[in-house]
Amino acid sequence: GICTSGTDVAVSTIGYICEKMHLSGIPYEAAKILTDKAKMKDAFRQGGVSAADGMRVRSAEEAQKAAEQLGYPVVVKRVDSSGSRGITVVEHSGQIEEAYENARNGSARDYVLVEKFLRGTEIGVDGFVQNHKLVFLAPHTKFVYRGAHTTVPVGHAFPYGCSGALREEIARQMQLAVTASGADQCSVNADVFVDGEKVWIIEMGGRTGATCIPELISTYYGFDFYEQMIKSALGEETDFQQTESCPCMAKLLLSPVSGTITQIDRDQVERLRQEGLELVLDYPEGHEVSAMADGTDRIGHVIVKTDREAELDEQMKRVYRCIWIDGKNLETIWEEKTAK
């Protein structure tokens, strides 16, 4: 079997292999649709999915015309990247050319997507599809950070509190997106906007989300989500039955500045872990880190069993005190950044 988690990089390859080798997994055509935001937009439109209006463009001039037609603000997107890369929110015409170049650079396509900017609350929705039907649905709160070009997801929380009517509409729109894309025998992850009981599916991936989502699903629902993904890929029977309900949340460890990790207080890190904190550090001392621009700039993560963001943030501060960038404590660096 073959599957992936948290990235679109391998999804098309997985679809191709599953098709050629008759394995359990995402169909190749669905994989191609769900790794190209423009193709996805076309499929959603044809499938009646509630989504933002958008247009495919091949030049800055076409992007300008599309933005004028859609009405500002718009979002200019690289069509073949995930993790908020190549995405810019554009407020006026003077920003279009730079946004277009940001989207085109690093893309294997000769077009980008210009999309109407939606207002509302951004949430995440993960699920699992079997026999073309959603058999598991997990909406969750999304923590975002406003980057240079767009908002960047930096964490998630379970459960997402909402009315029964809103949950039903989320499920309905997700199923429409699944049907429109042809996704099957795979996990899905969607960026969703809600306003009252109105739901828009911004985009959907044919794999589970990143930023600790599988770990949080496992913690909240009481089953190992990674195990169920692997079982599905192997063609084995899966079980998404919730066995417990443990509120939990996570955030990425990030740096607002580029530099080198000069010190990690390993003794304190171990004490925090012994207290029950789920703490992962990606890099050792001496490793260079980048100022956060998207989720790939993470230097670790923290998971806490709580329903209070303030409690998570306090634990994040304790971890940041353990890390030094270019001789300065990371908690201090963040305090100086937010004070500006």
Predicted features and spans:
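Glycine-rich phosphate/pyrophosphate-binding beta-alpha loops
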Residues: 84, 205-221, 285
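Phosphate-binding core of ATP-grasp and ATP-grasp-like enzymes
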Residues: 103-111, 116-160, 168-201, 205-213, ...
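Peripheral (often C-terminal) accessory segments that flank ATP-dependent C-N-forming ligase machineries
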Residues: 230-340
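Conserved N-proximal alpha/beta basic substrate-recognition cap immediately N-terminal to
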Residues: 1-56, 65, 298
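Short, well-ordered beta-strand elements within core beta-sheets of diverse protein domains
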Residues: 88, 116, 159, 218, ...
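Short, flexible turn/loop "capping" segments at secondary-structure junctions
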Residues: 76-80, 150-151, 292-297
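Active-site nucleotide/adenylate-binding loops and adjacent lid/helix of ATP-dependent enzymes
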Residues: 33-113, 119, 131, 160-176, ...
